[in-house]
Every structure is written in C-alpha cells, then in structure tokens.
A protein has these predicted regions:
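Short hydrophobic/aromatic beta-strand or adjacent loop that forms the aromatic wall/cage
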Residues: 24-26, 126-132
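Short amphipathic alpha-helix that is part of the acyltransferase structural core
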Residues: 1-16, 28-30
Length: 137
C-alpha cells in the first residue's frame, strides 16, 4: 500500500486496487529511493497475464519511464505466459498500440458497472473497457 498514491493515478478506486493487488505482482521503477513508475500484473489465464495498473509520477511523465517498465515486464512475463492483456479506455489505446497491443474485445459498461463514481479521462466519460492483447512469445 506504500505505492497507493501512484496506483490511484491510474485507477481512482482503492477498493478495485485492493482486489487486484492481492492477486498480482507489483513492479516498481525507482530513482534512488523514490518510486517513479509502478505496474501491477495479474494472471489472466493459464497462458496469459493482465496489466492491471501502470502509473507514473506526474513529475516524471513523458520521460520514457513507463516505456522502460513495460519493456521489462514483457521480458519478465514472456518466460511464464504467451500473451499479455491490458484493459483501458479510448485515450490509453494509442499508448499501448506503440508496444504492439491490438484490440481483443470490449466489456460494455465496465466502468459504469464497477465504479461507484463516474470516471472521466481527458473530459470523456468512461463507460466501456477496451481489452488489448500482445503476444509475448
């Protein structure tokens, strides 16, 4: 929970974070003792994992830290899984597409059904979760 402030940047619902933290692995990229970027990855199936949270401290954004962490995650999880999924909303698709993620499926109403408050990203109300997939092997 020491990284909760960073995790909340990517997912504003602490109850949701608690759920996937229990099932997942936390990865932290730090500069010295200061955490800069965090990620949580959980099993998705026997052959795939899911990136549940990826967040970078605002003062370190747009400097390549999330990219470095993602590349490390791909190498680490390629030994255990064939693919990685990530659930995101519209604004996040372009970021993940840079790494070779492509659309897998959509969960209609995910954000409105699972979050107590409406979620907005770049002024847009989030409703559906877009699942993207990347082959790791």
């Amino acid at each position: 929970k020491q990284y909760l402030p960073l995790l909340l940047l990517a997912d504003p619902c602490e109850a949701m974070i608690d759920r996937y933290l229990e099932a997942g692995d936390m990865h932290v990229l730090s500069i010295g003792d200061a955490p800069v970027c965090v990620a949580v990855v959980t099993p998705y199936s026997d052959t795939a994992c899911e990136l549940k949270n990826l967040a970078t401290d605002p003062q370190f954004q747009k400097q390549g830290y999330a990219t470095r962490l993602m590349e490390t995650l791909f190498k680490f999880y390629a030994a255990r899984f064939q693919a990685m999924y990530v659930g995101t909303a519209g604004p996040g698709v372009a970021f993940y597409a840079r790494f070779g993620f492509t659309h897998s499926h959509t969960v209609t109403g995910f954000f409105t059904d699972n979050y107590p408050e409406p979620l907005y990203e770049d002024g847009v109300l989030l409703t559906d979760m877009l699942y993207l997939k990347k082959e790791l092997a």
